[in-house]
Structures are given as structure tokens and as C-alpha cells.
């Protein structure tokens, strides 16, 4: 096994059973905690649906078929086939389909912007999921221990704050418990469902799609509004695709079809049966279906499950941001590894604290899970619509499927997604504006950074001196040579690094060995170590060293030098090597490019990004930073 192959979730290849257990603990947390609030929200008084046995049968029928069509058929059967070297998620899918279109074409730009916008919507989900999940679980105290009702929000805030505070220490130790806890959770969901099903088995009639269609036709507009709440059972479906690289498609499919889907369906049918038997249970169908003696233990188990679901979303936000950094859409940030065994476990302090502030603010502002339910959904449906569109492009361009088949599948899935999307649009005024605003702000920042970097590269190429002719001329009339190795980090091997020009201008020396090191991010998640480094000898002790990384990897200078030693015979003595880095100060100008205010925003982002020496993990005492100003 190569070193890069270990960059998946586990360093050693575990058995399928272990992967299934791991997937149950991580992948299904979000969708697995939806029973806490989904059905309760479907019968919210604001929807204007008169409570009746037929309404219960209709809503349960819609829930059932939505789960079958969107999760089981669309995601598990079709979308999970679209892997980028084993990785899933909207960014991996975007990178996959971009290979099939001409670079810099209008089509490529549209696909790229769709992928980035879909990814940005995830940040809205990353704020809402921990808040609504933990809050809805702790609200069980209102049923199990009414005297503690006033402490619901404080307890929620303490749990969430603790969750974010432990992120810097990693979750490797407690992560081993995630699988068993979530397995217990799903078994409990199924058992509760069966317990209530036997009291009103007529709820099983909901399997017939007639009841779903009849409900939609009879209630028309009100039923359309209810679709926005029905969608809550599907939140977390995207996680099945996103986490595919951690566990593999097969373990996720086994976990879904063997354990998760049956238990979720049993629980939703059980909640429906309880409502047929006890209509007053509509106040909180989930906790009122639990026998009184077990209500408090169930609150504790539900809280554990929602914390695990929140952890999965937080880890997803770290992973997504790390990918966006490598793809050039986000400024460099400190990326810390929290586990020596599980390379996928990373921690980004900036993202963590920003999420903490937003999540705490959301809980304090919205106060109840039913209020948060209105804000939930719009961001997820947006990502789902984009994933469906990109998957259709993949079917046609990558898999070369028949256009008629692609049209039928793509249109069918898109119509279902758009119905849920339109229903969620009705919730914008009630709170849906928040994740939309958050996602749109993130998209604007990412595109500003991407456009600014393009401008910066263009200016550097315009003003730059071709590297190879310059080195040839320099070696013909060399300055004083000094012992040791100089490594010049550069974004382009076509032009002379500004740091070299400044070194020659001020120090008037050239090291006996000069290495121009550049990092290239490819459109695949991982690069094999055998293909990671390549070298070009320019003569006279000057070399171009190119290191390639996947978009799920973080560059590490020390590892690159070790690899160059092993693979290319280029030995580096760290204490005799100096690393020269140009620290660019961006100056907004009226040159053609972006508006001045947007260039100022880019300059601020550039200034506040992590130092290259920190990001590339270069020993601080071996770094020489040389400042330069660049107008854009």
C-alpha cells in the first residue's frame, strides 16, 4: 500500500463489517436523527392541514416514497456510482465532470460555479444541523421531565459549546463509540416503531402510493407547503455521497439497506400508528411514542445521537474547507491533524470558532426546534438539485450513457428535487433566509478569492521574467556562490520567483544548489507517492522540483523533500537548507479586473490568510520571507 493510499479514513484496510459499523456511526447521523422533529413539523398548525386519519396516512405515504425515491434510488443506486477515485460529494463530482469539458469554456465556468455554490450551501447546513438536532433531543425533557423545561436552551448551549471546544483534541478516542451508539439508536428506533405499529397496523396501508397522491390532490396548496416539512426526513442524504471516500460505497449501501432504512421506516410508521391511536401525540410524536419509563433514557440516547450527527457535519465542514483551499477557492488556513492513525481527521481553528459563534447565535435566536425547522431544508435542497444536475452530466459525459436514458433519469430526479426546493422556498421568510444568506456570502467570498488569485497570477505572468533563460544567463555570469541549498517556493515554474530576484538584489549571492519548488493540485482526491514528485535539471546546480497533490491532501514541504530523497536521489540536509518565500502585499488599483471594493476585500483575505511557512509546515528557523507589493 502506498503512503497516499492511507489517506483514506483508515490507515489499514478493515473488514467490511468494521466499515459498515463505522459508516453507521458517521454517515447516517443527520438522516438518522430526523425522526425527532420531521413528523412533528409536518403537522405544524401553520400548515393549515386538518388532523385526520387520512391526513396521517397521506403524510406517512409521502415520507415513505420520498425516502425510497430520493435516498434509496437516486443517491444509493445512482449518484454513488459517480465517484472521483473513490471520493464523493459535490466538489469531487464537479472536479470529475470538469475533466470532460474544455478548460476556460463557458460550460466549464457554469459547472464550476454550480459545484462551488452547492458546496457553499453545505455551510448553511453545518450551522443548522447541530442546532436543530441537539435542541430537538433536549426538548424531550419537556415530555420526560417537565420541571426541567426552562433548562432546555441552557443545556443545549452547554452541549454544543463542549462539542466545539473538544474539536482541537480530536475525536479519535470517542470516535470508536460512534458506531455502537448509533447502531443502538437505530435498533431503538425500529423497536419503538414495532411497539406502536401493533396498536394500529392499518398505518401500513401508507405503503400504497395512492394515499400520497390522494393527499397531494385533495389538499393542493397546503400539501405543497407540507412537502417542505416532509423534506426533513431526507436531510442527511447528501452525507451518504459525501462520506463515500471514507468508507466506500458498498459498506454505506449495506448499512443503509440492512439497518438504517428499515429502522427509519419502522419508526416513521410507528409514529403514524401512534397518531392514529392517540391524536394528541401530535404535540411531539417521537417522545410520546416512547413508554413513560423509557422517556428519560431515550432523551439521553437521542442527545448522544444528535451530538454524533453534529460531529459528522462539523468534520464535513473541516474537510470541505480543506478541499476548497487546495482547489484555490479559499485562502490558506492552519490545518491541524488530530489523529496519527486516521488521516481524515483534521481541525481548522478558524472554521471551528466561526461555526461555534453561528450555532450558538442560531439557538438563542430561534429558541425552538420547530422554528429552526423552517430554516432547515432550503440549503440542502439547493445542494441536491445541483448534485442531480452534475450527476446527469456525469452519466452522459463520463459514463457515456444513452442520451434518452440520461434525460429520463435526470428529469425524473430533477422534478422531485425541484418540488422539494420550491416547497422550501415558501419558508424563506420564516427563517430559510438564514442558510441562504450564509451560503451566498460564502459563495461570494470564495469566488472573490478565486478571481483575485487569477488576477494575481495574470499580473505575475505579465511582469515576470521567463525562468529557464534567466537561469541560463545567470549561470553564464554567476554571482558569488555560497554553500548550502536554497529552496524557492513558487506558484509558477514559468517565471522567476520574486524571492530570488530580491535575494540577488539585496544579498548578491547564489547558493551552490538552487531548487524551485512548486505545488500543483490535481482534480483527483489523492496522488500516489510514485507520481507525486518530478524534477527537471536546469544545470549548474539549479533544479525545478514539482510536487503534485490531490484536492483532499495538504502539502507538506518536509514530506516532499523526504520523497525527493527516496525517489529522485535529491538529498536535503534541513539545517543547511534555506526556504525563500515571497510575502505579497496586494494593492487594489483601477487596472482592469474586479471593482475596487472587491479588490479591497481580496486584499484583506490575502493579508489574513495563513503564512505560507505555516501552511506548508516549514521549520520557522529555516524560512526567509521577502516582501513584495503587487497591484491588481
UniProtKB/Swiss-Prot annotation:
Record's keyword terms, sorted? Cell inner membrane, Cell membrane, Ion transport, Membrane, Plasmid, Potassium, Potassium transport, Symport, Transmembrane, Transmembrane helix, Transport
Q: Which Pfam families match?
A: K_trans, K_trans_C
Q: Which reaction does it catalyse?
A: K(+)(in) + H(+)(in) = K(+)(out) + H(+)(out)
InterPro entries from the UniProt entry: K+_transporter, K_trans_C, K_trans_N, Kup
Q: How does it sit in the membrane?
A: Multi-pass membrane protein
The molecular function GO annotations come to: potassium ion transmembrane transporter activity; symporter activity
**Transmembrane annotation, as ranges:** 19-39, 59-79, 110-130, 146-166, 178-198, 213-233, 256-276, 298-318, 346-366, 373-393, 403-423, 428-448
A cellular component term from Gene Ontology for this protein is: plasma membrane
Q: Which PANTHER family match?
A: LOW AFFINITY POTASSIUM TRANSPORT SYSTEM PROTEIN KUP, OSMOTIC STRESS POTASSIUM TRANSPORTER
Q: What does this protein do?
A: Transport of potassium into the cell. Likely operates as a K(+):H(+) symporter.
Q: Any idea what this protein is called?
A: Probable potassium transport system protein Kup 3
The record lists the organism as Cupriavidus necator (strain ATCC 17699 / DSM 428 / KCTC 22496 / NCIMB 10442 / H16 / Stanier 337) (Ralstonia eutropha)
